[in-house]
Structures are given as structure tokens and as C-alpha cells.
Amino acid sequence: MHKFKLSSHLLDLFSQYKFFSPIHGVQQLSSALVFESRLGRKIIYIPHSDYFSTFRKICDSLYDDYLSQIPINMSAIAYVEGKSYFNFIEPHRNNFFFIRIDIRHFFPSITDELIRNSFRDYFSESAISDIVKQSHLDAIVNFLTLNILDSSINSDFKESSILPMGFPLSPVVSNIIFRRIDIIIERLCAQLDITYTRYADDLLFSSRGKIGGSQTPFSKDSSSYSSFIHTDRFCESIKKILAIDGFKINKNKIIKSKHTLSLNGYTIIGSNNSDIRGEIRVSNKKTKIIEKLLHELNNKKSDKAIFFKCFISELPIPKYPSKKEKFFNDFFKSQIDNKLSGYRSYLISMIKFDEKYDCFDSFAIQKYQKLIFKIDLALSKR
């Protein structure tokens, strides 16, 4: 099998990188050299601005020339071009039993050694040059990972080298690394007639079940329904598979349900009968903010008043204090225009998805079409 070697273009970019040595090659970043911040219970790492421009160019080149050519499993949905959260939940709508399993510490559980072992199939282990003795593989691994120092706020992974959440290529790399686990899980599910999809650290499984007694397929809740995915044995099987590469289940986030499953503002209305079509629904909360914004615009309030009523956000600092008023007027207008355009794209994406999969309620589609019309009208008046 042909293995990748770093191109002259990429090596030229690396030569401009602050942490590249003409003798030792790419040096691994440490947590002291990036910005650390908490996002809930997760820790995000952002490269500092003094080297980010070159860092980003290297990321783009790595993706375009190498990582985009490495296969991932079809069950992986997150960070995949052309796929959305709808692709994560839609395959499950014609099933009745659901279980969502969350992986604990997903990104930091992907160590430099795990990446090296996986990427060994794709990147050459020969030296970059007669002068740079570092291998092509080690250069890539060092660039992608982060050494967590004892001074880091990440108490769970101190003195470890991890795939950092927040780095541009980490999502893509995670799908490549997880491919082996995805394949093993997929094979298990194929044997048991279970549907499986994965959105980053969220594993979603569904199946139809056996109906006992006098229950009908139309019943929504009955103890006589049964499915293997709701058993401890199934969870234990997934736990053992994840452990192959050092991943662990977050037991507190396991969700089991029958007929209906709600995840992140989306609901799957399942079916246990081939004659009944399952559906996807979007929570009213997601559309209410659109309706609220349109209502405020119809009341002809100022962009500033609408911004503070509909959105919570920190205000930027004007570069020129003397032009403060114009700066904020432009800011509020652009924010509202961007929100309207974003909501419009979101609604259109749902309609297009429904045209392909026929998975939304017809009344919901009519509602989205009306909202798009109102957004178009609002944008034409701005």
C-alpha cells in the first residue's frame, strides 16, 4: 500500500511554523502554548494568535492533500461534508426501541499513540530528509496532538498527549481513528438487526421489538415489548468494543426509550410496524426564536432593541471610539441580517431533507415554508 509522504508544499509551510526545527522536525505543542477554556465540563484548546495563521494553513493543506483521502465509516455523521444532525437521527425513525450511549472524554481519550497506530497504515515511517530525521508519521502525529502539562486545567489528562478539542483537524481525525470501532459495532448490529449511527461521542442504536400478549403495534408503552438493545448485555457488549481503543461509556448519559426519543431539540417518533411511517420533529423552541425575531421586526423596533431582546451576546469593542455609534449601528444590523439568513438556510435544509427522505410531518413543512416567506419579506425591507 502506498503511504503518504509530506509534499514540498507542506514542508515549506512547516518551515514557516514557529514550532518546526530544521533538524528535529515538528515539535508537539503543550498546553502552556495554547489558550485553554472550559465549555461546560469539556475543555477547549485554541492555538495562540501569534502562530495561528500558519497553523491554519498547515491544517488546510493536511486535510486537502491527505486526511480527506483516508476512509471513515458510513455510520459517522458529525464533521462529514454533506451530512447533518438529521442524517444522524433519520435512519432510526422506522424503529421502536432506542438507546443513546455517550462516550466519556471522547477527544482526550484519543492519545498520540492511538493516532500513531492508526495513521501507520497511511503515513510513511521513513525520515523526512537526510537532515530532518523525524519520520513523516511522527511529524503528523506531533502536529495533531497536544501535551497536557501538570499546570493545565485538565486534571483528568495531565502528563498525557491527546487529540485536543478545539484544534481544526481534531473532528476529522476522530472519525478516522474511530473507524475501527465503528466497523466492529456495525458488524454486531448487522447480526442483530440493529440500526447504528454516530455523531462524534453520541452513539445511537435502534431496533424493532417483539410484541407479546394482546398488545397491538400501535401501542406506545407496554411492558410486553422487548428489545435486546435495552438489556445490560447489549451495553456490556458496546462497552467491551469501546475498550479496545481505550474509550469508556458515560453511564450517567445513557438514554433508553420506546416509540419516542428526544435529543438536542429533535424528536424521533418511531414505529414498530412496516405500515406506519416514523417521523422526525423539531422542537418548538427552535422555531420560536425565529418567530420572536420576526415579531419584533414587524413591530418596527430598532436593531439594537431587537438584538438585546432576542439574543444574548457580548458586544465587541469599537476600534475607533470616535466612530462608536456607527460601529454599533452596523454591528446590530449585520447581526440581525446574519441571523435571518442563517434561519432561512436552516429551514430550507429541513425542507430539502424531507424532499429526499419524506420524514417530516406535512404540517411542519408547511410551517417552515411560511416562516421562509416571512423571512424573505423581512430581508427585502432591510
Tell where the protein language model's regions lie, with residue ranges.
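Right-hand nucleic-acid polymerase module
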Residues: 1-101, 106-117, 121-131, 141-167, ...
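Active-site-proximal polar cores
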Residues: 170
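Conserved binding-pocket/active-site segment within a compact domain
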Residues: 173
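Long, contiguous secondary-structure blocks with strong helical propensity
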Residues: 181, 186-194, 208
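Short beta-strand
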Residues: 195-199, 253
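Short beta-strand-to-loop capping motifs
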Residues: 205-211
